[in-house]
From Swiss-Prot:
Function: Methylates the 2'-O-ribose of nucleotides at positions 32 and 34 of the tRNA anticodon loop of substrate tRNAs.
Main localization of the protein described in the UniProt heading: cytoplasm
Pfam families according to UniProt: FtsJ
Record keyword S-adenosyl-L-methionine present: yes
Catalytic activity line of the entry: cytidine(32)/guanosine(34) in tRNA + 2 S-adenosyl-L-methionine = 2'-O-methylcytidine(32)/2'-O-methylguanosine(34) in tRNA + 2 S-adenosyl-L-homocysteine + 2 H(+)
The protein's name in its UniProt record: Putative tRNA (cytidine(32)/guanosine(34)-2'-O)-methyltransferase
GO biological process entries: cytoplasmic translation; neurogenesis; tRNA methylation; tRNA nucleoside ribose methylation; wobble position ribose methylation
EC annotation from Swiss-Prot or TrEMBL: 2.1.1.205
Alphabetical list of Gene3D superfamilies matching this protein: Vaccinia Virus protein VP39
Length: 270
């Protein structure tokens, strides 16, 4: 299906065609960087849900450039293949799988990313609550893999839809980042519910053990049960067991809240 006449009249659509961008969404990332300098000092970047590649294209032009800096490494991840881009390594993978995070780190020679971005979105149904929920789950999946692959102090940017539960999303991100804000670049249509969540200075909770979790959290009771079992067994715990218990205790608080905003656990998060 061809582009609508509305798209063809859009200044950014025309500009994208003129400048050779794969999609008008390239300007959204460019404008976020121009206002917030998210590319400053960045060497290792991950583009999640990257296809068709307009954001990876921005990274290729703005960060990889002429390729003279051997420390610059860009990884694009998507279930779909996309046309090659200069300086961008592509991973055809699922962001909800731990194996994908290991592939990313291997391309960084064991180091972690400075910046992780995601412009992904599920198919829109036109039903606001369903679309907002689907997008929120995609963001949390991106956050899951980010906790495995982003360095302390790093930055995370993701597309989201404006909705009633934005305060919940804000609270979830604030558990991991010092600074969290919602931004809307001028190239994002005013009529669109699209926003971007900008998270800076990654600082995970003390004793948080990164793991890839089911966004629906069907098995989160296993975490709680493991915590209780480890607390009740082995009264003569050694130091290692005590440390393990601290990790489990932290997970039993953080993981349910991140996965679905579950606050019905009888605990405080601080």
């Amino acid at each position: 299906m061809g582009k609508s006449s509305k798209d063809k009249r859009d200044i950014y659509y025309r500009k994208a065609k003129e400048e050779g961008w794969r999609a008008r969404s390239a300007f959204k990332l460019i404008q976020i960087d121009e206002e917030y300098q998210i590319f400053e000092g960045v060497k290792r970047v991950v583009d999640l849900c990257a296809a068709p590649g307009s954001w990876s294209q921005v990274l290729s032009r703005r960060i990889y450039g002429d390729g003279k800096d051997p420390d610059v490494k860009i990884v694009a991840v998507d279930l779909q293949e996309m046309a090659p881009l200069k300086g961008v390594v592509q991973i055809k993978g699922d962001i909800t799988k731990y194996e994908t995070s290991k592939q990313i780190i291997s391309h960084f020679d064991g180091s972690l990313a400075d910046l992780i971005i995601s412009d992904g979105a599920p198919d829109v149904t036109g039903l606001h609550d369903i679309d907002f929920y689907g997008q929120s789950q995609l963001i949390l999946s991106a956050l899951n893999i980010t906790t495995h692959t982003l360095k302390i102090g790093g930055t995370f940017v993701a597309k989201m839809f404006k909705g009633d539960d934005m305060s919940l999303m804000y609270s979830q991100m604030k558990l991991f980042f010092e600074h969290v804000s919602f931004v809307k670049p001028s190239s994002s249509r005013e009529s669109s519910l699209e926003n971007f969540i900008l998270c800076r200075n990654y600082q995970p909770p003390l004793n948080y053990n990164p793991k890839i979790i089911d966004p629906a959290l069907e098995n989160h009771n296993k975490i709680l049960n493991n915590n209780n079992n480890n607390s009740n067994n082995n009264n003569n715990c050694n130091i290692d067991n005590e440390n393990d218990n601290e990790f489990l205790k932290t997970d039993s608080l953080i993981v349910p809240f991140i996965a679905c905003g579950d606050l019905n656990l009888g605990y405080h998060l601080v």
